[in-house]
Amino acid sequence: EGALLAGDTETGVSIMLLDKEMDHGPILAQEKITISETETAPELLVRLIKLGSERWTAILPDYICGKSGATPQDHEKATYTKKITKADGEINLADDPVEIYKKYRAYSGWPGIYYFLENRTRIAIKKARFEHDAFVIERIVPEGKKEMDYVDYKKNALD
């Protein structure tokens, strides 16, 4: 989520040994991948899990036999992210469309993104895209209702 939220174009996996500190141990392997412009967190997670398991399977035999070792981590280059909460998914449709789309991509799994109408009805955004410098909502779930097309919702709201 952090890479998508930051607008990064690449991310990757690190296979590390554990020590007493969080994300601190020596590194056995690292590999980067490119993030597509439309990829969401759940889609990216599938690719990262596959990549991580492939790298782990490839390095494990040599590590067990002592043919390869771990490299100390450069803690100056380490990156950290914050804990995500449900409140992080709230958006304001008046905000920068680029930033809203980053949130959509990062939080499309959990917590999802949503906004509130003036009457405090929560609208969860299930599908969206970025097109012509605009955040375009395609599918929503209004609080207490079933998923629907955003165009139909807006049309019915105006009737």
Model feature map: region roles:
Residues 1-2, 82, 143-146:
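Generic secretory/membrane-interface signal
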Residues 76-91:
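PAPS-dependent sulfotransferase catalytic core
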Residues 7-9, 83-85, 106-109:
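A short catalytic or substrate-binding loop motif that flags glycine-/basic-rich loops and adjacent residues
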Residues 1-80:
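Donor/substrate-binding cores of folate-linked one-carbon enzymes
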Residues 88-159:
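An anion-binding loop in the catalytic cleft
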